[in-house]
Amino acid sequence: MIALGIEGTAHTLGIGIVTEKSVLANVFDTLTTEKGGIHPKEAAEHHARLLKPLLRKALETAGVTMEDVDLIAFSQGPGLGPALRVVATAARALAIKYNKPIVGVNHCIAHVEITKMFGVKDPVGLYVSGGNTQVLALEGGRYRVFGETLDIGIGNAIDTFARELGIGFPGGPKIEKLALKGEKYIELPYAVKGMDLSFSGVLTEAVRKYRTGKYRIEDLAYSFQETAFAALVEVTERAVAHTGKEEVVLVGGVAANNRLREMLKIMAEDRGIKFFVPPYDLCRDNGAMIAYTGLRMYRGGVRFKIEDTVVKQKFRTDEVEVVWD
């Protein structure tokens, strides 16, 4: 069975084509701005402009035609309304034109589900990106959120800090590079609130300290990372302890950070459990994860009518009954 997936929840438009066992194509185009941030209307215009050429590229890369595709999947939410609507409209049009079944996929669930292509069975997932920070796992037939950010996503916090330091966007790789040269830990507010996280306090204090001119930016970058990532690992470890799961996966754009990977790996080794990070092109927002999750859903008996494909900007993971595992 071949599934085509369209991702477009935020600034990345991605189209993926997969089978149960392999990725045939996974192409994307990301809207970038010098100052960072995403305007929903601009994201929608970007997606609308690039959908046809990107679809053509995906089909060529996979070596298939639309007639060969068995299923259309799309990111139904959560995300930016205008961007989601462009993707949903395109998915509906393809499904109707080529008489294919259609499935709407929860973007956050897809980030975790794609790891199952690599043999992961039942993990606790730490999903970290610009707008999202969640610890989630399957419990009682649904993906439960065991902890999440109460304010801003870790990726947005890092990018905002980088902007304040004047080192540009995207900030993640630049902060990581600076942090490697850090020699001294500077105390910052800890980001754990029960099982949830808050990054506004650590961000505000790091910026305040930077503006005093008394601290090296390398030390501030190092301290920011250590403080924020320690909180992420702590909440993930608590979820592991609560659920008794024996696998941890790291997904989302911030999964590119080597220090975060290292800290999670140490935690997993200490607990005697497995740790896995997918290849980066399957960590970031991408169409292949949407296609793969849609395929698993369809195989498990999930069916959508066209009227079921309305986008959901605030689509919670626990709204989805997982009947396909």
Swiss-Prot record:
GO terms for biological process: tRNA threonylcarbamoyladenosine modification. Keywords: Acyltransferase, Cytoplasm, Iron, Metal-binding, Transferase, tRNA processing. PROSITE patterns: GLYCOPROTEASE. Its cofactor is Fe(2+). Fe cation binds at residues 107, 111, 127, 285. It is found in: Cytoplasm. Substrate binds at residues 127-131, 159, 172, 176, 257. Transmembrane segments: none annotated. One of its GO terms (molecular function) is N(6)-L-threonylcarbamoyladenine synthase activity. The keyword Lipoprotein does not apply. Binds 1 Fe(2+) ion per subunit. The keyword Metal-binding applies. PANTHER family: TRNA N6-ADENOSINE THREONYLCARBAMOYLTRANSFERASE (PTHR11735:SF14). Belongs to the KAE1 / TsaD family. Monomer. Component of the KEOPS complex that consists of Kae1, Bud32, Cgi121 and Pcc1; the whole complex dimerizes. This is tRNA N6-adenosine threonylcarbamoyltransferase. It comes from Thermococcus kodakarensis (strain ATCC BAA-918 / JCM 12380 / KOD1).
